[in-house]
């Protein structure tokens, strides 16, 4: 059967990509990705040109079905020139450098498989990447992984960058237990209610937030637990990387004084002082 590689990509600094990730991206047949434009730019930076299949949160289940069909296809069934319709299908499923493969191309691969049985031929290999970081960690990927595994294919992790572990490595947190919460609800009432629950557990927790809502999140945190300890990372691994450490009140005052916050934010919140 085929193999799905779940590949972590840099969260900012492209030099953080691993040698193993590059090797996999160079050798797979198709790269499924959250945003084809961003992934095409990433691959082009490293001189890699592959077929791209869109697999975003809103179409992940549909994309998973297409990719499973692809993973079940012997490579030679649609890459080797054959007579008649099989030859036409083989030509049409070849992608030009950087070309995106849509439903029609994958369907042609399935049609070619139905026309002939190739014993002993290796099956397709697919890589999945999110826009940045590790797929499935507050990013699409979980639906695809479950579907591919349930279909009997192999799923292989290719570890690498993650905003979660990047922040933890420089936070200096001593807590043995750290809860990863990810993104809270954008709804103010639900967000504050969840913060009340999290702070009541007296366990360090990690949040992700967009630059557009981080000030509101900090205001809610101050209302719930103003003396809680916060490490806020912004633009991690990028040129304007910033770490802000202090009480929730101090960090909020620092950020609310700005007219505009740029870059994704990661927050570690703890009752214990760092």
From Swiss-Prot:
Coiled-coil regions listed: none
SUPFAM superfamilies: Tetrapyrrole methylase (SSF53790)
Stored Gene3D superfamilies: Cobalt-precorrin-4 Transmethylase, Domain 1, Methyltransferase, Cobalt-precorrin-4 Transmethylase, Domain 2
Keywords tagged on the record: Cytoplasm, Methyltransferase, rRNA processing, S-adenosyl-L-methionine, Transferase
A GO CC term attached to the entry: cytoplasm
Pfam families: TP_methylase (PF00590)
Subcellular location field: Cytoplasm
Major localisation: cytoplasm
InterPro entries on file: 4pyrrol_Mease (IPR000878), 4pyrrol_Methylase_sf (IPR035996), 4pyrrole_Mease_sub1 (IPR014777), 4pyrrole_Mease_sub2 (IPR014776), rRNA_ssu_MeTfrase_I (IPR008189), SAM_MeTrfase_RsmI_CS (IPR018063)
E.C. designation(s): 2.1.1.198
Catalyzed chemical reaction(s): cytidine(1402) in 16S rRNA + S-adenosyl-L-methionine = 2'-O-methylcytidine(1402) in 16S rRNA + S-adenosyl-L-homocysteine + H(+)
GO MF annotation: an example: rRNA (cytosine-2'-O-)-methyltransferase activity
Function: Catalyzes the 2'-O-methylation of the ribose of cytidine 1402 (C1402) in 16S rRNA.
Protein family: Belongs to the methyltransferase superfamily. RsmI family.
PANTHER family (alphabetical): RIBOSOMAL RNA SMALL SUBUNIT METHYLTRANSFERASE I
Name of the molecule in the record: Ribosomal RNA small subunit methyltransferase I
Gene: rsmI
């Amino acid at each position: 059967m085929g193999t799905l590689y779940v590949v972590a990509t840099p969260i900012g600094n492209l030099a953080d990509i691993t040698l193993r990730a590059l090797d996999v991206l160079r050798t797979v047949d198709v790269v499924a990705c959250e945003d084809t434009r961003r992934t095409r730019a990433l691959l082009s930076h490293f001189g890699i040109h592959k077929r791209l299949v869109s697999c975003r949160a809103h179409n992940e289940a549909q994309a998973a079905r297409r990719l499973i069909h692809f993973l079940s296809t012997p490579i030679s069934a649609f890459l080797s020139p054959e007579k008649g319709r099989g030859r036409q299908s083989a030509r049409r499923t070849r992608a030009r450098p950087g070309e995106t493969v849509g439903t029609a191309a994958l369907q042609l691969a399935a049609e070619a498989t139905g026309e002939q049985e190739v014993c002993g031929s290796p099956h397709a290999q697919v890589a999945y990447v999110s826009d940045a970081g590790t797929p499935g960690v507050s990013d699409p990927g979980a639906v695809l992984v479950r579907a591919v595994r349930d279909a009997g294919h192999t799923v292989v992790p290719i570890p690498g960058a993650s905003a979660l572990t990047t922040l933890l490595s420089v936070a200096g947190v001593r807590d043995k237990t750290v809860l990863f919460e990810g993104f809270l609800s954008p709804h103010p009432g639900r967000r504050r209610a969840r913060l009340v629950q999290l702070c009541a557990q007296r366990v360090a927790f990690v949040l992700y937030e967009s630059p557009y809502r981080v000030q509101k999140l900090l205001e809610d945190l101050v209302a719930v637990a103003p003396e809680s300890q916060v490490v806020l990372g912004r633009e991690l691994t990028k040129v304007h990387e910033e770490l802000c450490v202090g009480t929730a009140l101090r960090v909020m005052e620092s950020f609310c004084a700005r007219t505009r916050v740029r870059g994704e934010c990661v927050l570690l919140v703890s009752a214990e002082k760092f």
